Each structure stands twice: as C-alpha cells, then as structure tokens.
C-alpha cells in the first residue's frame, strides 16, 4: 500500500511542461490500437486491416509481413527481442514464436502441455520462458517450455478485485513484470513472481516502456512515469484526435486510434 500511495502522490505533484513538439508525417490503417509492440531496434509491429502482422521500420515504412497460416485472433504481440517475437492467440490458447524474418520458430498449444487454466495474457521472460495470467484461477504463472511445466505460480486472489479485474497486458521489463489491469492499475512483480506493489493509473488500454520510463495515453496527453524516481512528465497531443495508445521511438511517435495509426516526428 505504501508503494501505491507514494506513486500516486508523485504523479500528482511532479508534472512538468512538455519538452517536445510533434510534426505529422503520415497515417496507416490497422485493425487494433492495442495489439501492437516495439522492438529494441525501434521497429514497430502492428496488425493490418486483414490482421496480418506488419513490421514497420523506424520511419513507419512497412518492412515485412507475416500472414498467419491458420485462423485465429492475435491478441498480444511482444517483440522487444526481435530475434524471438511472441504472438499470443487467446481464443486458441496458443503461443507462436517468430524469428527476425517473421518466420515461425515454434508453436505451443497450452492445452497440449496440461496447462489447466485459461490464459488471458502472455509475454516473454528474459530466460525464454512465458509469463501467463490465468483468468480462471487468478494466477500469475511462468511456463518453462524445456521442462514443459510451470516454474512459478503466484496466486492473485488477494491482490485482484475479483468483481472488477480486467487484465489487458503483461510485460517483463528491467527484471520486473508489469500487469495492466484496466480497472485497478498496474501490478508490479519481480522476475520470480513475487508481488512488489501497484501503480494506480486506471483506465489504461496499453502501456509502453522507454529507458527508465513507463508511458501511456490518457486525457489527451502522452504521460511518462519514471519507474525509479516516480516523477512524471507529459506531452499534449493534437486536439480533436481520439488517441488510445502510443509507441514512442527515438525520432518518431506512433499514436493509435480506432482503425489507424498516425505517425509523427519528434522535434
């Protein structure tokens, strides 16, 4: 609770004026403003209107396409490691890994390895295991594919609001695991699955990470939150735009709304 209150106080008191201006470049159609990702080299991954996976270069130009061979809805993309890109199909309970050329490396059906829950969200860990959020049993699990078993199981029944939880995203970043709950905020765990606290930013559809900051779109602003000092800064976004999420590169900012992404240059 102390962590939660400290973060809330810092966020309220440390607002800084925006330091950068945005210059519009171009737009692209897409199918989802939340099924998005960015790798450590600055490439962006989105789903086109036909739900094919597109990789865009740092300027927002299409580089590669992956057309899934079978039907299914890609619900999560994790591409931070461009050598091993994760696609999670919630409806099929399947995790697909792609290489740097967007070619399949492996496919794992969670039901084939006796995973008894219903995974709502999935992401990669630094040791090439999978983090899974089990919606049925309200558990954070770590799946080791080499052992074909769970190596971490953290019950969340005393942490989550049973009546209102709505987990949208998970991400391991700098040896911590961040779980985004739309209604309650961001839950933070260490890389052993131990609960460390929460960050009370509610109503978020997606969170991104850049250096030591977490960022998100809310109330017409792109908000940045320092993971270590709890300071925050914000950038006013163009008026009249219903932006939902963002991906921030070194020179480009990708702002996502329903049906398209607008690409801007930082200045």
Predicted region positions:
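WD40 beta-propeller blade core
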Residues: 54, 96, 141, 187-188, ...
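Short coil/turn segments that connect the beta-strands within blades of beta-propeller domains
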Residues: 41-42, 82-83, 127-128, 174-175, ...
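Beta-strand-rich domains and repeat architectures in extracellular enzymes and scaffolds
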Residues: 26-49
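Blade-level signature of beta-propeller repeat domains, shared across WD40, Kelch, NHL, RCC1
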Residues: 245-267
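Short loop/turn segments that connect beta-strands within beta-propeller blades
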Residues: 57-61, 99-103, 144-147, 190-194, ...
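A short beta-strand motif characteristic of beta-propeller blades
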Residues: 21-28, 61-67, 106-112, 149-161, ...
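Repeated scaffold domains used in trafficking and secretory/extracellular systems
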Residues: 31-37, 72-78, 116-122, 162-169, ...
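Conserved beta-strand positions in repeat-built beta-propeller and related beta-rich domains
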Residues: 38, 46-49, 86-91, 132-136, ...
